[in-house]
UniProtKB/Swiss-Prot annotation:
This is Phosphoglycerate kinase. Pfam families: PGK. Its main location: cytoplasm. It is found in: Cytoplasm. Belongs to the phosphoglycerate kinase family. ATP binds at residues 203, 294, 325, 354-357. Keywords: ATP-binding, Cytoplasm, Glycolysis, Kinase, Nucleotide-binding, Transferase.
Amino acid sequence: MQKKSLSDIAIQGKRVLMRVDFNVPLDSNKKITDDKRIIESLPSIKKVLENGGRLILMSHLGRPKGKVNADYSLAPVATRLAELLDCPVTMAKECIGTETMQQVLALQDGEVILLENLRFHPEEEANDPDFARELASLGEVYVNDAFGTAHRAHASTEGITHYVQTAVAGFLIERELLYLGKALQEPERPFVAILGGSKISGKIDVLENLFKKVDTVLIGGAMVFTFFKAQGYEIGNSLVEESKIELALKILDEAKNKGIKLLLPVDVIVAPEISATADCHSEMITAIPEEMIGVDIGPLTAEIYRNEILSARTVLWNGPMGVFEIDNFAAGTMAVAQAMAEATAEGATTIIGGGDSAAAVAKAGLANEMTHISTGGGASLEFLEGKELPGIAALND
């Protein structure tokens, strides 16, 4: 999927309206607890400022439900951005209106203003055309660099593109299209997908789409117990989606018919309860005790999965292998992260599909050892499901 990007347009002296994802976590004192998203948007921001553009940034933060709410002001972000850029960042009181327009028109080349939270207006999420038109009037060119909201047709991501001639991708979205897009369209083979998480229902569309592309699928997370139940194994008190047992059998059949190697764990870590203090040990999947809960893949499985990962040229990972937030139940997820890092070092393309997997890789301290970590949660998932993302479809080809 080729889209025009920030590198393809003239910026000098132009008002550049950029949608970024500054939806960062704040503590009770309105201090930013994780500025990763701000840092990720810096390459696009610096490109505009260094090339003499006049930058207007817009974002949402949290869920203020269409009302002005000071708890969700982007002011702390403006402060942090000014520190990171080492230059002043004007904070607008609003994202539309006469005063905002005057501030925008007063910008000089290489200056930047951050508009107030878009979601203070219900029209943003409703993709209201008048609101979109008013936003569009602030800039001469539009750049979308917010992959995390690209799966939503909102005024600032989709509606706005109807009122601008130039609508291009920022560097973050360009990277997502490059890595996620290439993996889905022309992966180097063998292509191994690792899918985890608690529910088959959450991953069924991803599985269906990946079955057209992959050579091998490794399954982990609590969704394995629905497969085991379907195969007639006892699973103790492990999480199971009773309504998805038929579906699990259908998936196993489909993999077989398509010649896809679909691997399930051979052993799992079990515990009497999901708590940080619970004792845990490994059991073969044929011998899960009645009162126990499966919480992670076992060491034998971790080794099998590691070998599969190391034999691949493209590896895509979405969803943890177990309850990795609890250290005692994190070994399987950490082993996969480690194997991915080793595969990267050996020249494979390794892609983390956002969300929990990204958190797991960060917890393992291996975030810099992957080819690409997607910045979108829901957006990455929908992309992997083969769905068109409105915020990306709307950009210039």
